[in-house]
Amino acid sequence: PRDRHAAFFAALGVVASSIENISIEIRHMQRTEVLEAEEFFSKGQKGSSAMPHKRNPVLTENLTGLSRLVRMCVVPAMENVALWHERDISHSSVERNIGPDATITLDFALARLTMVIDKLVIYPENMIANMNKFKGLVHSQRVLLALTQKGCSREDSYKMVQRNAMRVWEEGADFMTELKNDKDVMEVMNEAEIEDKFDLQYHTKHVDTIFSRVFNSEV
């Protein structure tokens, strides 16, 4: 039976998808208008043959393509499960190709991704700047939940938060200021409670615990 082989190649495909998922995130963060992180760029390296100013994420772009090659081997492995009378050799020619291709490619991709992450350049100041561009909108969910916990219905809470959020979108207003100027919101929450919902540290309070769990060590 080749079902165990199919499960093996499916697992390789899932790992490849995770590699691509991480790679796409890095590629997005390296976009010129975002620039929250980027692949290491050595002196004299060319980022684009046509536009000298660019610093393209060539390694993670390569990893995206390699991930597709690994996943390409999953379907043939699934098709190999159906053999005549539990045994013929129609699977053999397939496995002789996808076996080496999938495993070697994935091994290379994992090594490359490890290197990319080890040398990844991070720009925390740009992360903060990008967050601040939205004038507090990223905290809308916490305000919504706080209103419901204060006894407001979810529908009413949503309306209160949304109308203030839309003024930020449409008029460039400050979200916290709009909430403090909304009499319906202020009847439920005070200024200190609103300000508390805008604390970015709330969203990263478990980071050390997560790293400790993943790496099985104290951070």
Task: Please describe what each predicted stretch is.
Residues 1-83:
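Internal glycine-rich alpha/beta core junctions
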Residues 51-219:
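Glycine-rich cofactor/substrate-binding loops
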